[in-house]
Regions:
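Bacterial N-terminal signal peptides that target proteins for export
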Residues: 1-8
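Generic cytosolic/nucleocytoplasmic N-terminal low-complexity/intrinsically disordered segments
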Residues: 4, 22-25
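C-terminal motif of bacterial Sec signal peptides marking the signal peptidase cleavage site
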Residues: 17-20
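Short, compositionally stereotyped local motifs that mark structural "simplifiers"
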Residues: 24-228, 234-236, 241-245, 252-255
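Conserved ATP-binding subdomain of kinase catalytic cores across diverse folds
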Residues: 179, 212-355
Length: 355
């Protein structure tokens, strides 16, 4: 019996966006300059704290997901960084207008322009964590590799409502994945993988020129940035994978990887699926963790603990209902000699914001 690997988003999106840049052939400009060492590993901390960074070179860091060796928002480290509760902080990725990446438009859009039925959420409505990315530059101007860590302040019940009941019912921890990547790689109109972008604008211009459309949702069928496929539309990202429950979190993966939009028709939804790729171009060529524990075994009965890719699935055609329809039917077929999908609930944060 063959089994595919899927993590299912555990919660309905509040409203979100992302942006895309870089491609799979991006050259590594980093050297062997001493990497930045963080005084605390990513995870959950009951109270705010001061984070120390150390390296042989001058340290620069960012808090917006961008690469500090390339970003114009990088800050030169000159002392401890305060890591505190971010409740109520201004949204960034969640502030992007859903109109830019969703085609669930009002049926009156024909006369009034494209108007999404969903508004971006308020600052208070989006749970947040802190993501610090840091790199060091030596006297010759050479950069180290970028180090990234994700921090949650307070208890996990403060961040994820119902996590205690969820873990008790499932008998296991909840998967929480923090995705960090450049904003433009998600939302830029030319290279952003999450938005409709230039590809959609060109298709839409031809579409309205035909003057035969009946309702705004017809635009879901149009080509867009998010519907593009292949390595050209893969972007570089970083993931922090935590196994979480009401008592704390274990960081089981801290890894750079590739990311693409996943799905077919659901690519035009507000909450889109992601496919993650481990490649030597980004570091390790495998995700080395038994994500599904003893549930997933090879033909010899050994637990599978290395993966080249896995999917963060937002629900597909069931995204607006239970989200778990496919997962349920797959479990019923698990004992049959055919291909099935292993899955488990997962909560996703994007550049420090609940997605």
């Amino acid at each position: 019996m063959r089994t595919r690997k899927i993590l299912t988003f555990a919660a309905i999106v509040l409203a979100a966006v992302v942006s895309g840049c870089s491609n799979g052939n991006k050259q590594d400009t980093h050297t062997d300059t001493s990497e930045v060492v963080f005084s605390r590993q990513g995870g959950i901390y009951n109270e705010e704290f001061e984070l120390e960074l150390t390296s042989k070179g001058a340290i620069y860091y960012t808090t917006d997901g961008s690469d500090p060796s390339e970003s114009d928002t990088s800050i030169k480290y000159d002392g401890e960084i305060k890591v505190a509760d971010r409740s109520g902080d201004a949204n960034i990725v969640s502030a992007v207008s859903p109109t830019l990446f969703c085609t669930n438009f009002s049926d009156y859009s024909k006369d009034d322009g494209l108007i999404c039925r969903i508004d971006a959420p308020s600052d208070d409505a989006v749970d947040k964590c802190t993501v610090i990315r840091a790199a060091a530059k030596d006297s010759a101007g050479n950069w180290s590799a970028v180090t990234t860590q994700t921090y949650f302040i307070g208890s996990m019940t403060d961040h994820i409502d119902g996590i205690e009941a969820n873990c008790k019912a499932s008998g296991s921890a909840l998967a929480v994945i923090s995705i960090t990547m450049d904003y433009d790689d998600l939302f830029d109109s030319e290279k952003g993988i999450y938005v409709k972008g230039d590809v959609f604008d060109n298709a839409f211009e031809k579409f309205i020129g035909n003057k035969n459309w009946i309702k705004a949702d017809d635009t879901r069928k149009l080509d867009a940035n998010y519907s593009q496929r292949g390595r050209e539309w893969e972007r570089e990202a970083h993931i922090d994978f935590f196994e979480m429950n009401e008592n704390g979190a274990d960081q089981v993966l801290n890894q750079d990887c590739g990311i693409r939009i996943q799905g077919n028709y659901s690519r035009s939804d507000l909450q889109k699926g992601f496919r993650l790729y481990a490649r030597k171009d980004y570091g390790d060529n495998k995700f080395r963790y038994d994500i599904w524990g003893d549930e997933l075994k090879d033909k010899d009965g050994n637990t599978i603990d290395k993966f080249k890719t896995f999917v963060l699935r937002a629900g597909g055609n069931c995204a607006f209902t239970s989200k778990y329809n496919d997962t349920y039917w797959q479990t019923l077929a698990a004992g049959v000699d055919c291909s099935t999908k292993a899955s488990r609930p997962c909560v996703v944060y994007l550049n420090g914001e609940y997605w």
